[in-house]
A protein has these predicted regions:
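Single conserved hydrophobic/aromatic residue that forms the stacking wall/gate
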Residues: 1-21
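Beta-strand-dominated extracellular/periplasmic modules and repeats
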Residues: 23-181, 190-202
Length: 203
């Protein structure tokens, strides 16, 4: 299941957002109609692993009062380790990984917690300006029964020098930028298999 609108950026927190993703999934082009709730993006092909550094993304979804939100649907989609989306409209000349779809979904538990297993996405060139590259990022879509539209954002990774040159990231007010960068979770890092990152979401 994969969206052709992959490069659309929408800010998540309503204080600094005026846009949302379309809630009408019929308007989105998909590669597969076999939607399933799977938070392990490493299991696209049985007994085969995608190329790249394995990572875990975990976090908590809360409201502005700090209360955890249960049953929130979180979708993610991303490029593979070479910076290539599994998207027929992607013109980047990197190779498609046959063992990686680049899409996952899960629901928050009663404590508002969620978790994904995936690979670290690669940066990729894009046509916004000369020599332009997008930093490593993962797209997030947040769906709540009480939200009429899907809220979307992008999660970035710490210490990525390409953030300094990315017009999408830099269009965000400085005081909010750090909220879009995942935190490396050294305490829960699983050596040697996974790097662990924390990304909390406030609705």
């Amino acid at each position: 299941f994969f969206f052709s609108s992959r490069r659309r950026h929408t800010r998540l927190v309503s204080d600094w957002s005026s846009d949302v993703c379309s809630s009408d999934l019929s308007k989105l082009k998909v590669f597969s109609k076999n939607f399933n709730m799977n938070n392990n993006l490493l299991l696209f092909k049985k007994n085969k692993s995608p190329i790249g550094q394995k990572i875990i993304i975990k976090g908590k979804v809360i409201n502005r009062r700090g209360n955890p939100l249960k049953g929130i649907i979180i979708e993610i989609w991303q490029a593979n380790a070479a910076g290539k989306y599994r998207d027929k409209n992607d013109t980047h000349d990197a190779a498609i990984d046959p063992n990686f779809l680049g899409y996952g979904a899960t629901k928050t538990n009663s404590n508002g917690d969620y978790k994904f297993k995936t690979i670290l996405p690669g940066a990729y060139p894009w046509g916004n300006h000369k020599n332009a590259w997008r930093p490593k990022h993962i797209h997030f879509s947040i769906i709540n029964e009480n939200i009429s539209n899907r809220l979307c954002t992008q999660m970035y990774f710490p210490n990525d020098f390409l953030l300094n040159y990315d017009p999408i990231y830099n269009s965000i007010a400085k005081k909010y930028r750090n909220s879009l960068i995942a935190k490396f979770d050294k305490k829960n890092n699983i050596v040697p298999n996974y790097l662990v990152f924390t990304f909390d979401i406030v609705l």
